[in-house]
Amino acid sequence: MMVCGLMTLVATEAQPLMRTHVETGDVEATPDGTDLAVYKAIPYAAAPVGDLRWKAPQPAKPWEGVLKAEDVAKWPPQPEKSYVKYDMMSEDCLYLSVATPAKSVDEALPVMVFIHGGAFRTEHYGGDLWQSLARRGVVAVSVEYRAGALGFMAHADLAKEADGHSGNYGILDQIFALQWVQRNIRNFGGDPSKVTIFGESAGAMSCHILCASPLAKGLFRACISQSGAMMSPLNVVNQMQAQMYGWMFMNQLKKSSIEEMRQMDAKELTGNDANFQACVPIVDGYVIPEPICDLYEKGNYNDVPVLIMYNSDEGAVDFDSVSVEQYAQQFGQLPGQWGDSAKVYYPGNTEEERLYSMRDLTRDVGFGWPAYAWATMQKKTGKSPVYSAYLAQKSDTTVYAKGNRRGAAHADDMMYLKGAFDDKAEQYPQEKKVGELMQQYWVNFAKTMNPNGEGLPHWPVYEEEKATVMQFNNGASLVETPNQKRIRLIDDFMKYVRSLRRN
């Protein structure tokens, strides 16, 4: 009898943490068929509807009984696509998920908080619950936030309601979610002092904003960026510009006040979202005090260890063909010396050259240079380590890419980190190897703020002139800064643009 009782106790203790308590009530997980408890939808803020539309997030309301977090929440309102229709959306969207391997609330595991991409207009947290990482010993959180006009519209009348600033509601949602994590993650077996934020595309840009925002100070200790940074002076939208775009959007909708716009159906707003010009985070003097490149130059940012990666064929999602006219228009926009040099580095004499040059230009301007600028500037003005990575693995499988690819397209990194090849070793042996390496490096970084660990190729901190960039391609090996001559040409041009803006 004693042996049976002991065995029952051990079995009970070995179960995932299927029920716990948060500040608004009790919540119950769903098992994922392995050794994790997955809470698919926990409200971290009140529904941003009615008078709360275009306002900072407010605390979620308590509930009675036990909230069964069995299904992911609906998508935030956004334009319809083939895979998401309006009946799948709701303005009541401020939810997060938690996947935990903890068996008790006392385990104090590191925490990884993911912010999804989607150009600040689209997508959903529910596709990325991160069981692949949680199984390696972290508590994985995925956050939803407001997008499109509902998340980023600024207007002078909204500024009057909020001490002079407006817009950036989606970023305020992310900060509010991180504050919720600080208060509640212990009850999932997580350690609030060991939070790493990570994101892809617009989610990576969000992570960079959080690294720069004084409102996010102390909410995380490390950051991973996958294909996104906010260093470009070409992307700077200030409060006055953003409010002008908001005024134009209101006029297009034939509304005369914020009150009228708050009465509109979210579907009508998102159906016109393409007409909303400023769907980007705003330099509002509050969430983002100054252009982020300026904050980094001055050393005024949250100085935490960072791991920054982009992909070798990012532009494959944008182009499957490029005409002579498209090529000429793109490179004709560059002034004198930069236009001439660009045509050397990005030739366009043949159809194939034009296609690959436009893809490479998209990669280098949109992802490569921002990653380089972030890494080099933080090395110069910060104290925390910087790690740099480059995903070059080509696979038959891709997320969004068009036509022939020469490497990893935009968002392909998600396949490797989510474990898409974990059970396909025979068909995709190299992809499986890369996926396992990336997952372990990422989790090590969350655990120790250093990606290195037993059995992994050594990854040194980034140095511009040395082979310190970890390239993932049929394994992992160190290379010098990829596409270096092109990146330095763009760096020279961006310095010129910044000088014009200052003058």
Segments (PLM) and residue ranges:
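Bacterial Sec-dependent N-terminal signal peptides
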Residues: M1-P16, T398
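Non-catalytic accessory segments of hydrolases
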Residues: T12-N168, P192, A425-M438, K447-H458, ...
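A structural signal for well-ordered alpha-helical segments within the folded catalytic domains
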Residues: A37, S90-L94, L172-I175, Q179, ...
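Serine-hydrolase-like catalytic core of hydrolytic proteins
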Residues: K81-I258, Y286, L295-F319
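Structured segments of extracytoplasmic/periplasmic soluble domains
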Residues: R136, A177, N184, F188, ...
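Short, solvent-exposed turn/loop segments enriched in Gly/Ser/Thr/Pro and often Arg
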Residues: R146-A149, F198-A202, A389-T397, P457-E463
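Surface-exposed patches in mature extracellular/periplasmic domains of secreted proteins
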Residues: S193-T196, K255-M264, V386-Y390, G453-V461
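Substrate-gating cap/lid region and adjacent catalytic-acid/histidine neighborhood
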Residues: E260, K267-Q430, Y441, T448
